[in-house]
């Protein structure tokens, strides 16, 4: 499967080859594999997709850190080139985080904590995690997004999932999920975020909710049942 993804995106991987080692060692010749060293460990990749995903993220971090462009990817990429190669990052997650079997196990504890906060927590609960946590939640909840100039479904640095609880006129509680990211240049320039210079935001449909009153709203009861079903699947498997 991993080798098939490499073969399906030749232009993207050739562009990464040009950024990493133009005229040098062909990293595309390295065998591609999915690795899991021990039970309970999230799978990892080896080969071109692993190198491409981590390399693209490294180039992004160099750009966000406001390094001179001659020091970003050895001066071989501009911002558009970085954004293009960054598509390798979510591509890797289609194998290591988004599949249901992996996502259910990797995100169920975090989803349970989110559910608890929505049902009986304080008005504001802040949970700090990693891009992998977001990719796992996305796989578990069936989330997809494209905003801020990043590739589709890429969880960039500083991205946040906002689970908002509201009530309709009858008092029925609903969960709305907002995904928020700062653009590359907002982070690179340390922009002050204001109403006139906002981060990119989008309300995401929770595809696996099952009881959606609107495309981007899920009843709290439906959200709770969805989390319960996920935990049941994890135990059953």
Task: Enumerate the language-model features and the residues they cover.
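Signature for phosphate-centric chemistry
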Residues: 1-125, 131-237
């Amino acid at each position: 499967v991993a080798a098939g993804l490499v073969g399906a995106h030749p232009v993207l991987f050739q562009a990464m080859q040009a950024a990493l080692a133009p005229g040098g060692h062909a990293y595309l010749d390295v065998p591609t594999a999915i690795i899991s060293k021990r039970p309970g460990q999230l799978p990892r990749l080896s080969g071109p997709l692993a190198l491409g995903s981590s390399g693209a993220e490294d180039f992004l971090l160099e750009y966000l850190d406001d390094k001179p462009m001659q020091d970003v990817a050895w001066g071989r990429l501009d911002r558009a080139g970085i954004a293009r190669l960054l598509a390798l990052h979510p591509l890797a997650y289609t194998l290591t985080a988004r599949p249901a079997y992996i996502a259910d196990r990797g995100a169920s504890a975090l989803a349970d904590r989110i559910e608890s906060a929505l049902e009986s927590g304080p008005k504001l609960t802040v949970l700090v995690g990693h891009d992998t946590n977001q990719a796992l939640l996305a796989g578990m909840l069936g989330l997809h997004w494209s905003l801020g100039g990043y590739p589709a479904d890429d969880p960039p640095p500083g991205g946040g999932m906002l689970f908002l609880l509201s009530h309709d006129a009858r008092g029925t509680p609903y969960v709305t999920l907002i995904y928020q990211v700062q653009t590359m240049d907002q982070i690179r320039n340390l922009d002050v975020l204001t109403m006139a210079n906002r981060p990119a935001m989008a309300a995401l449909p929770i595809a696996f909710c099952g009881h959606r009153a609107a495309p981007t709203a899920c009843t709290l009861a439906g959200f709770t049942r969805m989390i319960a079903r996920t935990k049941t699947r994890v135990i059953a498997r």
